[in-house]
């Protein structure tokens, strides 16, 4: 018995017919050649079937890269933001521009190396090159799995300098953060609420911009913000789901949001007017305003780096730091249990309160 490894009726029917045809060809081959191959009884039946299957593969059985992209987006793209489809499609376009749209078994290591060299020549940073290779490898591997192909991925294991062009983000000094928070309180509008909210929680911008008002819990013994997945805003990793106690400027911002007269269910309605949270729009607007107050090279994301430094400076244990920031620690033990309670997290956050 062989599993067709798909829930899609169309693909199941196609693969069932294909498997049936391959078996029929195999038995026909045995009937015709058995008398001519004295050592056949000693051969591995598994190897024979595999070899016969590969010999009988036709172009019709193997998808091209465009078809591989389509099935990848159809199944893996469900519930993902538009940026996911856009990034995968962009990478596909790059590969086609360099090597053309071919059947998967026709792509070579040479194609992969030319793709790498083209990305580098284009001026992409090491992290961007890594991201493009991640997408093309995922598209290729998913199609190989779905179509049960015996193919190696020519885009796997290609070397490139991951540090090329990467600018290390500098943390923002604590005194500058305090000045920034005071300016936010002075202006007191929704853009400044978002900056203040991020400043004392270490949240990612997309996490903050996609919040519901109901994610801000102010009536508990310890006020906190709940970071959870929403249809309009995904989370980066499983570790990103967490509760962060609210202190200082972040608590102030949460109170302003809850007490605002806006009837929207979103904490930041202006960035949630479409199907997905417009984190890029928020980034552009907030970084432009912050530029006058922070050192050169610092951005809104620097607040996240700063929170890690602030916690480190008070000798906060690394696993607590990781839980507050939603960082993946890489240690096995952190995947067990429910993590630290709000009282423990709050104790350490209170130590870095700038007020």
Feature-to-residue mapping (PLM):
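N-terminal helical hairpins
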Residues: 3-82, 93
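N-terminal DNA-binding recognition helix of tyrosine site-specific recombinases/integrases
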Residues: 94, 102-110, 121-156, 204-206
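Basic, Lys/Arg- and aromatic-enriched nucleic-acid-binding interface segment
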Residues: 126, 130, 156-211, 240, ...
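Short, charged phosphate-coordinating catalytic segments
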Residues: 141-151, 198-222, 318-320
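Conserved tyrosine-mediated DNA breakage-rejoining catalytic core shared by Y-recombinases
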Residues: 210-253
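Short, polar N-cap/turn motifs at the start of nucleic acid-interacting alpha helices
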Residues: 216-222, 296-297, 316-337
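Catalytic-site neighborhood detector that most strongly recognizes the C-terminal catalytic loop/helix
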Residues: 231, 251, 274, 325-355
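Active-site/catalytic core of tyrosine-dependent DNA strand-transfer enzymes
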Residues: 247-296
């Amino acid at each position: 018995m062989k599993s067709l490894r798909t829930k899609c009726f169309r693909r199941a029917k196609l693969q069932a017919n294909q498997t049936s045809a391959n078996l029929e060809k195999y038995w026909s081959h045995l009937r015709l050649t058995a008398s001519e191959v004295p050592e056949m009884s000693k051969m591995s039946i598994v190897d024979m079937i595999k070899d016969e299957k590969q010999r009988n593969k036709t172009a019709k059985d193997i998808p091209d890269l465009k078809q591989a992209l389509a099935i990848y987006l159809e199944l893996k793209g469900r519930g993902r933001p538009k940026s996911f489809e856009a990034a995968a499609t962009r990478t596909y376009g790059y590969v086609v521009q360099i090597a053309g749209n071919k059947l998967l078994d026709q792509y070579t290591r040479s194609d992969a190396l030319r793709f790498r060299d083209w990305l580098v020549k284009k001026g992409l940073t090491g992290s961007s090159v890594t991201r493009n290779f991640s997408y093309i490898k995922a598209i290729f591997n998913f199609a190989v799995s779905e179509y049960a192909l015996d193919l190696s991925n020519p885009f796997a294991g290609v070397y490139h300098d991951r540090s090329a062009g990467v600018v290390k983000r500098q943390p923002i000094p604590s005194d500058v953060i305090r000045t920034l928070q005071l300016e936010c309180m002075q202006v007191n509008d929704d853009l400044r609420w978002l900056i203040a909210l991020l400043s004392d929680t270490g949240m990612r911008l997309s996490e903050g911009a996609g919040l519901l008002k109901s994610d801000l819990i102010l009536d508990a013994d310890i006020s906190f913000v709940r970071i959870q997945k929403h249809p309009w805003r995904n989370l980066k990793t499983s570790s990103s789901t967490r509760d962060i106690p609210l202190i200082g400027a972040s608590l102030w911002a949460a109170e302003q949001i809850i007490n605002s007269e806006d009837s929207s269910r979103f904490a930041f309605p202006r960035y949630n007017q479409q199907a997905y949270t417009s984190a890029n729009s928020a980034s552009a607007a907030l970084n432009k305003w912050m530029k006058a107050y922070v050192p050169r090279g610092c951005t809104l994301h620097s607040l996240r780096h700063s929170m890690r430094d602030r916690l480190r400076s008070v000798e906060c244990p690394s696993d607590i730091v990781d839980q507050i920031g939603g960082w993946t620690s890489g240690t096995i033990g952190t995947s067990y249990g429910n993590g630290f309670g709000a009282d423990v997290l709050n104790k350490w956050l209170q130590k870095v309160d700038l007020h």
